[in-house]
Amino acid sequence: AMTQTELLKMIGSGAVRDLDLTGRELKNIDFKGCRVENVTFDECTLTECNFDGCGMERVSFRKAVLRNCRFRRAKIAWSDFRYCEIERATFEEAEIRFCDLYRAMLTGIVIMRRARIGETSLYYAYFGEGVNIRRENIAGGRLLQQDLDAYRRFLIEWNTSGTGVRRNDRAEQSAWSPD
């Protein structure tokens, strides 16, 4: 497994790629301005981590807990936030595209000012009262599930560009995977 020192060295190089950090406890890590690609934070607890200005692709935060994390002006694509708990965060001016927030829970103050969310699934996501998502945050003013053809394309694309075939809690392939 990668040590904290090795991780910080990788961050210092400006690119964090092809890493599996499943189940790790990460505190006060500053990824600011990094390229973060093909990284798995599944079931991690991230506290006070800074992803401001990051370019993030194929990053999985599945079942992770994010507390007081920052994603200001981050560009996040093809990333997995399913069952993720996001508690107090800022996504101010972030661009979120082709992501899956199925059953994600956002609680506390989560700042979405001028964030753009497009081609993203918010199916069964829970937004607490401190989360202010406005229509102008949603690209084209529509969510993916409201446009079934687009949603189906997203599910098919997700299997090639995203973080892989969706599975449900019982590790079976989800019924709402595309055929």
Report residues per predicted region.
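Tandem repeat scaffolds
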Residues: 2-178
